[in-house]
Structure formats: structure tokens, C-alpha cells
């Protein structure tokens, strides 16, 4: 998803387009990895001095509820990234930097075959580890 797509989702749901929301979405599009709310707040504070953590957090949860961003828990903390909408895939997530890599493999059919009497509504596969760049920096 890009910023314009996200703004379209906001408008389709009767929500206001604001420069703050656009700038927050731009951060996700530009960085393209999982980010915590504090990082977003610090980035936003450069252009909007004094922006509250509550304002950032409310918008993050609004974006998540609308499917604009995705979330995961990493090291006991919620992290967010722009939603991937181009095709079904899963992610490798670096535990150090939050960088993500696409995994174009989905085990859901195998899982369904092992659970024939259940109705699976949705699924999410995340693989965690240390990316090549962080490994290189550690050595």
C-alpha cells in the first residue's frame, strides 16, 4: 500500500485527511519495516513539535482497524508497518532492526489438511531472526 491508497481508505470510511495523518503514513511507506509507536512519535515531533504519544497511538490503531497498517508483537512491544496488499505472503522479521523480508510460501493448505474439521478464517505466519545486515554489524 502507498500513501495515496491509504488516504483513499480513510476517505472511503468518512474520516478526515490531515497533513499529520499523511506524514505518519509517509513514514511507514518510506521506512517499509516494523516500527514502534515511540519511533513514529519521534519522527512526527520533528514537524509537529509536542505531538502527543496518545495522538500517535490513536492513529496507529485507527490505521490498523482500517487495514492500512499491520501489527505484530516483538520483544513485548507492539510494532506496526504499512499493509502489504499486492499478493498473499508472509514475513521474516529481524528481531534487531524490524526489517522485513517477504516469504512467498504459505503452509495453510497443509495445515488445513491436518485440521479437517475446523473452519480457518484467517492466518498469519511470521518468522523471526536476525537479518544479514544486523549479523554483519554484530561481527
Swiss-Prot record:
**Sequence positions that bind Zn(2+):** 94, 97
Start and end residues of each stretch annotated as Dimerization: 86-139
The answer, when asked if Translocase is one of the entry's keywords, is no
Instruction: List GO molecular-function terms, semicolon-separated.
Output: DNA-binding transcription factor activity; transcription cis-regulatory region binding; zinc ion binding
Keyword vocabulary terms for this entry: Cytoplasm, DNA-binding, Iron, Metal-binding, Repressor, Transcription, Transcription regulation, Zinc
Q: What's this chain's function?
A: Acts as a global negative controlling element, employing Fe(2+) as a cofactor to bind the operator of the repressed genes.
Question: This chain belongs to which protein, by name?
Answer: Ferric uptake regulation protein
High-level lineage = Bacteria, Bacillati, Bacillota, Bacilli, Bacillales
Amino acid at each position: 500500500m502507498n500513501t495515496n491508497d491509504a488516504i483513499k481508505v480513510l476517505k472511503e470510511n468518512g474520516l478526515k485527511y490531515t497533513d499529520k495523518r499523511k506524514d505518519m503514513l509517509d513514514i511507514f511507506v518510506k521506512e517499509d519495516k516494523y516500527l514502534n509507536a515511540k519511533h513514529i512519535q519521534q519522527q512526527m515531533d520533528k514537524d509537529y513539535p509536542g505531538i502527543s504519544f496518545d495522538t500517535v497511538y490513536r492513529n496507529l490503531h485507527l490505521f490498523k482497524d482500517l487495514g492500512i497498517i499491520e501489527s505484530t508483537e516483538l520483544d513485548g512491544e507492539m510494532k506496526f508497518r504499512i499493509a502489504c496488499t499486492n499478493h498473499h505472503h508472509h514475513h521474516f522479521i529481524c528481531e534487531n532492526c524490524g526489517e522485513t523480508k517477504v516469504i512467498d510460501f504459505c503452509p495453510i493448505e497443509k495445515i488445513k489438511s491436518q485440521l479437517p474439521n475446523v473452519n480457518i478464517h484467517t492466518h498469519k505466519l511470521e518468522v523471526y531472526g536476525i537479518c544479514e545486515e544486523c549479523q554483519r554489524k554484530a561481527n
